């Protein structure tokens, strides 16, 4: 089995929740190709699923050392830092991911950073701008629905969820949110 096939197997195991075997594969990949970032990336993903944020950061830092132009590495490290409440490190990583390729996931995580930094109004304004600039990104509509719901604005939340449902009728999360309203 070549490197790419092993990597795909590790990612498949990760999706299935078999974290021990996915971690084993990540370590094998690192041993086989220590100059490739993907083995360390897989390790970082596994540790995120296990909520082992420091270990995830360590693995992602190694991945970034090897390949510093992949926005996903910065976004994931930023998310781990957000979980540890290292807010400024998280912000820097999200902004780097955005600078690299305008990562939609990093934009959403930057909204979470703003909320955790007690900048709720700034977060909402930022997300509304994202919706205006990219109205086809269903995840932005969902996140705005979540923010409105948490703010006690059920009617507004419902309109955001309904728009998300028009865009992605099979989205289970949106169906659940609308069913609870």
Regions found by a protein language model. Give the residues of each.
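Alpha-helical segment of the N-proximal tetratricopeptide repeat
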Residues: 2-38, 42-51
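Canonical tetratricopeptide repeat
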Residues: 42, 76, 109-110, 143, ...
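Register position in tetratricopeptide repeats
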Residues: 15-16, 49-50, 83, 116-117, ...
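Helix-start (N-cap) detector for alpha-helical repeat units in TPR-like alpha-solenoids
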Residues: 3, 37-38, 70-72, 104-105, ...
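Short coil turns that delineate tetratricopeptide repeat
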Residues: 34, 68, 101-102, 135, ...
């Amino acid at each position: 089995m070549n490197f790419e096939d092993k990597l795909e197997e590790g990612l498949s195991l990760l999706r299935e929740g078999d974290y021990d075997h996915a971690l084993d594969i990540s370590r094998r990949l690192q041993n086989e190709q220590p100059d490739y970032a993907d083995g360390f990336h897989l390790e970082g993903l596994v540790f995120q699923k296990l909520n082992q944020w420091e270990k995830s950061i360590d693995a992602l830092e190694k991945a970034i050392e090897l390949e510093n132009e992949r926005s996903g590495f910065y976004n994931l490290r930023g998310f781990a830092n957000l979980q540890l409440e290292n807010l400024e490190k998280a912000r820097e990583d999200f902004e780097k991911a955005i600078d690299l390729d305008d990562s939609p996931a990093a934009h959403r995580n930057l909204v979470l950073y703003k909320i955790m930094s007690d900048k709720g109004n700034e977060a909402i304004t930022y997300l509304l701008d994202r919706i205006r600039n990219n109205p086809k990104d269903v995840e932005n509509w969902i996140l705005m629905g979540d923010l409105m719901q948490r703010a006690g604005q059920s009617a507004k939340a419902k309109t955001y969820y309904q728009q998300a449902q028009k865009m992605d009728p099979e989205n289970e999360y949106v169906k659940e949110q609308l069913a609870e309203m």
